[in-house]
């Protein structure tokens, strides 16, 4: 009985850990999204979002969320799931890849509209792009947390150590290429949240 219990507890622990790195990314991304949402009423009322802050929001969206986090999924998690028989061109992986591409396109538009805003003070398109970006990413993260990751945790429960190492290797490589550290983005998220607290 004890051995079975310990074995089950070990399996449960492994299941939790197989996507822990990605869930940690999600928590950081959601933290930034909430403060991004808090800037929208300010922009609508004509208040100014300082250029350094807005530039960091764009950097986080395009580099941490896309290059780093999506990179971990596309170069590590998804290939591992393919090895377990989950197809790349249909089903959950195909949907996530499509949504990643949508995220990139909206982020690129948001970068362009942020430059327009910083140049002439017109926040009209920036507000539209930020709202679309936040709504899209929030829904995407929910699907991953509550659908894809549950399947991944079951499929990869016997390969946790390998998956964790692969995810960490991709994160380290992507951040090094960006000339950033995870701590840089965590620090930004903390500072951004203090300046623009999430709305209730």
Language model segments and positions:
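Small-residue-biased structural context
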Residues: 2-200
């Amino acid at each position: 009985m004890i051995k079975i219990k310990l074995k089950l507890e070990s399996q449960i622990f492994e299941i939790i850990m197989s996507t822990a790195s990605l869930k940690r990314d999600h928590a950081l991304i959601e933290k930034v999204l909430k403060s991004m949402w808090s800037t929208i009423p300010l922009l609508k009322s004509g208040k100014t979002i300082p250029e350094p802050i807005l530039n960091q929001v764009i950097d986080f969206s395009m580099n941490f969320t896309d290059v780093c986090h999506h990179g971990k999924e596309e170069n590590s998690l998804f290939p591992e799931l393919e090895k377990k028989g989950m197809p790349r061109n249909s089903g959950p992986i195909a949907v996530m890849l499509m949504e990643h591409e949508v995220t990139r396109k909206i982020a690129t538009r948001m970068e362009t509209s942020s430059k327009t805003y910083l140049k002439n003070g017109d926040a009209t398109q920036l507000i539209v792009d930020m709202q679309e970006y936040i709504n899209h990413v929030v829904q995407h993260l929910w699907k991953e947390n509550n659908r894809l990751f549950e399947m991944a945790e079951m499929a990869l429960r016997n390969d946790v150590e390998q998956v964790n190492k692969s995810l960490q290797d991709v994160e380290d490589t992507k951040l090094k290429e960006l000339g950033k550290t995870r701590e840089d983005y965590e620090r930004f998220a903390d500072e951004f949240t203090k300046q623009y607290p999430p709305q209730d």
